[in-house]
UniProtKB/Swiss-Prot annotation:
Protein name: Probable nicotinate-nucleotide adenylyltransferase
Species of provenance: Escherichia fergusonii (strain ATCC 35469 / DSM 13698 / CCUG 18766 / IAM 14443 / JCM 21226 / LMG 7866 / NBRC 102419 / NCTC 12128 / CDC 0568-73)
Keyword Metal-binding assigned: no
Keywords: ATP-binding, NAD, Nucleotide-binding, Nucleotidyltransferase, Pyridine nucleotide biosynthesis, Transferase
Keyword Nucleotide-binding: yes
GO biological process entries: NAD biosynthetic process
Gene field: nadD
Amino acid sequence: MKSLQALFGGTFDPVHYGHLIPVETLANLIALSRVIIMPNNVPPHRPQPEATSVQRKEMLALAISDKPLFTLDERELLRNTPSYTAETLKAWREEQGADAPLAFIIGQDSLLTLPTWHDYESILDNAHLIVCRRPGYSMEMASPKYQQWLERHMTYNPENLHSSPAGKIYLAETPWLNISASLIRERLMKGESCEDLVPESVLEYINQHGLYR
C-alpha cells in the first residue's frame, strides 16, 4: 500500500505559523509522507481575500520552500467556480487510485459544521478526515443523526489511516497556536511586528508588496 498523504486547504491570507506548525507536528505524530497545501478559490459572493490569488500562492511557495513535507497545489485557484471539498477529493482520488490512503485535514470547529458542506457524505468515500483539536470545542454534532455518523467513522488508532484508503475520522492532539490571519492583518495595518507569527520570507514579501496596509 502507498504511504499516507494528506490535503490541507485554506485561504492563507496570509499563511502563518498557526497553519504550518500544527500540521508539521501532525505529520510526525501519524507518519504522514506528504501534505499537499491547496489555497482556496474564493467565489465572488464571499468576502474577498486582501491578497490576490497569485500573491497568496507566492507567499505559500516561500513558506514551504525549505519544508520537503509540503507540496503546493494550485488547482482550485485556476477554477472560475466555487471550491467544493467533495469535488476536489473526488478528483484527487481518481488521480491517486482506489487503494492509496488519503486524508483531508480540518479543524475541530469545521468538523462540527461538516454536514452543511456540499455533498458532505461523499468526503469519507474518498478520504479519511484528520481533525486538529481546538480548545473549547466538543465532539458533539448538531443532531443524533450526525452524531451517529461521526461515531460510526471515528477511529482512535492512527494505524487505521494507513491500512485503509478512506472512511475514518481521527482526532489528533496537535498544538493550538492562537494565531489568525485576521490578527496578522490587523497588526500589519497598525505597523506592529509580526516576526513571531509568519515566516521571515513571507514577511519580506508582504513588506515588498505593501500588503495588508
